[in-house]
A protein has these predicted regions:
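Phosphate-binding/switch region of NTP-binding enzymes
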Residues: 95-207
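Conserved inter-motif catalytic segment of the P-loop NTP-binding fold
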Residues: 2-100, 104
Length: 207
């Protein structure tokens, strides 16, 4: 099963069905509150751990629950107090509040998720750090995300330029079939900036 937390209201069950996703195994939760998400994950992992330990006591071969959590996107999350600050015209304090709750969030959920082998995948916004000697892309949300993540991948995209392998393949297929195939899509570059499990290797793929 997959718990999909949508903080940007960009998903609905109908659109997910069109992509061929089994919505019977998907739980869609739409919220932008980091406190609410923390409570959802904490309560969920506590209940799953209780059930798992009970089953394990009677059956040593009991498997851990198969679940994946996806948050899209972490950069769009805010805090309950942050919403109140916007309403009262004090939004300037919001970033510091969010960074504090972000650190608390990871401290609360990292260990329970690890004990149950539940992966949590986050998408995030990036910004260019102008303070460094060479401007580099950094993830929003403070350092807590960088410290707690096992893998961080920076994605960038580029248009097909007609000289890449994908364009060459489409051109060859056009000639073989005798019809014109318009090149579309983009080339995505995946650059792992942190990984605890393997040597980071930059790669590219076509969408």
């Amino acid at each position: 099963h997959c718990l999909l937390i949508d903080s940007e209201n960009s998903y609905d069950v109908t659109s997910l069905d069109r992509f061929g996703i089994d919505t019977d195994r998907l739980i869609l939760k739409q919220t932008n509150s980091i406190e609410e998400i923390g409570a959802i994950i904490s309560n969920l992992t506590a209940n799953l751990m209780t059930q798992y330990e009970k089953q394990l006591a009677s059956d040593p071969d009991t498997e851990k629950p198969r679940l994946m959590i996806v948050i899209d996107s972490f950069g769009a999350l805010t805090t309950t107090s942050g919403i109140d600050q916007v309403a009262s015209g004090e939004a300037g304090k919001m970033n510091l509040t969010k960074q504090k709750y972000t650190a608390q969030f990871f401290r609360a959920v990292t260990t329970p998720l690890g004990q149950l082998d539940i992966p949590m995948i986050l998408t995030n916004h990036v910004y260019v750090d102008q303070g460094s000697y060479v401007p580099t892309a950094k993830a929003a949300g403070g350092e807590a995300l960088n410290y707690n993540a096992s893998i961080i991948m920076m994605l960038s995209k580029a248009k097909l330029d007609g000289k890449d392998a994908i364009s060459d393949k489409l051109k060859q297929e056009s000639e073989d079939l005798g019809i014109e195939i318009q090149s579309s899509g983009c080339i995505v570059t995946c650059n792992p900036t942190k990984t605890r499990f393997a040597k980071p290797i930059k790669s590219k793929f076509y969408i």
